[in-house]
From Swiss-Prot:
Signal peptide: none
Xref: HAMAP family: MenG_UbiE_methyltr
Gene Ontology MF term list: 2-methoxy-6-polyprenyl-1,4-benzoquinol methyltransferase activity; demethylmenaquinone methyltransferase activity
Record-given protein name: Ubiquinone/menaquinone biosynthesis C-methyltransferase UbiE
Catalytic activity: a 2-demethylmenaquinol + S-adenosyl-L-methionine = a menaquinol + S-adenosyl-L-homocysteine + H(+); a 2-methoxy-6-(all-trans-polyprenyl)benzene-1,4-diol + S-adenosyl-L-methionine = a 5-methoxy-2-methyl-3-(all-trans-polyprenyl)benzene-1,4-diol + S-adenosyl-L-homocysteine + H(+)
Enzyme Commission number: 2.1.1.163, 2.1.1.201
Disulfide bonds: none
């Protein structure tokens, strides 16, 4: 017979891909995935998407409305694709913060950007999206690209992003989502669960991390659900754009 006190005290669980794990373990498990893939992350992005991820990110930059002198926060900024472009846009009077919870990804991003001569207006900060270590009403734009699905408490992260934005500031969430066509969805599933882990094994000698990435995409809220989460957090004029048949969606919300 189950002890009701133990049941009451049991730690809440959350999904890690298709598995349920204690909430306290998810961040560490996600960290292990990205420690494993960090060195080959850019190469795998190009192979997995056929380079289309660059177009998705370009559209994110355009929709952000970033301009000279702005302060930008690039959460889960990883290897710095968005940060590099934002650094050019905001210029010497602006500021871009590349934040990532994973030290390995942050190091790869810092090294890559320094090699490309991106410095001066960029800071690198190891930070948890759920508890952002920045002042209230500080940033003009906050972005999170392909990172929200790995966050344990997504509502807390969205609320934290709202807090650090200035009134009128924009949040942009670029994330894998739900394909809008049923036949396309089946083909995408076959690719994600067969070819993707195989590529991970060949390129990084790690099929399990890429199996997790595929599973995490399926467990992420769909377009309308994420829109509702942003509205519930307090964002206004929330909208989203499906790209590549809904494989990816870009959500945008404004802080009132």
């Amino acid at each position: 017979m189950t002890d009701p006190r133990k049941a009451h005290d049991a730690e809440p669980t959350t999904h890690f891909g298709y598995k349920n794990v204690p909430e306290s373990q998810k961040a560490q498990k996600v960290a292990e995935v990205f420690h494993s893939v960090a060195a080959k992350y850019d190469l795998m992005n190009d192979l997995m998407s056929g380079g289309i991820h660059r177009l998705w990110k370009r559209f994110t930059i355009e929709l952000s409305g970033a301009r000279h002198g702005n302060r930008i926060l690039d959460i889960a900024g990883g290897t710095g694709d968005l940060t590099r472009q934002f650094s050019r846009i905001v210029g010497p009077t602006g500021e871009v913060v590349l934040a990532d919870i994973n030290a390995s990804m942050l190091k790869v991003g810092r090294d890559k950007l320094l090699d490309k001569g991106v410095a001066g207006n960029v800071r690198f900060v190891q930070a948890d999206a759920e508890k952002l270590p920045f002042p209230d009403n500080y940033f003009d734009v906050v972005t999170i690209a392909f990172g929200l699905r790995n966050v344990t408490h997504k509502e807390d992260a969205i609320a934290s992003m709202l807090r650090v934005l200035k009134p009128g500031g924009r949040l942009l969430v670029l994330e894998f989502s739900k394909p809008t066509n049923q036949l396309f969805s089946k083909a995408y599933d076959a690719y994600s669960f067969s070819l993707l882990p195989m590529m991970g094994k060949l390129i990084t000698n790690d099929s399990e991390s890429y199996r997790y990435l595929a599973e995490s995409i399926r467990m992420h809220p769909d377009q309308e659900t994420l829109k509702g989460m942003m509205e519930a957090a307090g964002f206004e004029r929330v909208s989203y754009h499906n790209m590549t048949g809904g494989i990816v969606a870009l959500h945008r919300g404004i802080k009132p």
